[in-house]
């Protein structure tokens, strides 16, 4: 996609993914590793787990017409689980439940960071809001990762990437 801004041309690649895309990429990483079936499930879930903080959208939709709407998605998505604190909790959980402890834990940490990276470069909403990633939360909120070149959530490369990941999952 090429955009013109102040007479300059910009080429942008969108890697923002839906939870389905995060799941597929995490599965591909886990499937290629020398780990047990159980550990593959843990790695795959670790790549999707950061989006747990997006579940607040259900409460927000159900209460939006009330006198006291719950703004759980607006306030907490990309905050509670898109940070190093959650990454460490995820790492400990994977070490506890995996059979090949450190190999599986490192793969889980890898897919967790792939998730964060992809959200970092492509989380812009249709209204132009760029979701920042509070990477050092809960230890510090001073460093918020965001990039002004983020693509919109519904951009065509997202669909293409998901289709490619689905093809790799099915055929490889």
Range-by-range predicted roles:
Residues 1-172:
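N-terminal membrane-targeting hydrophobic helices
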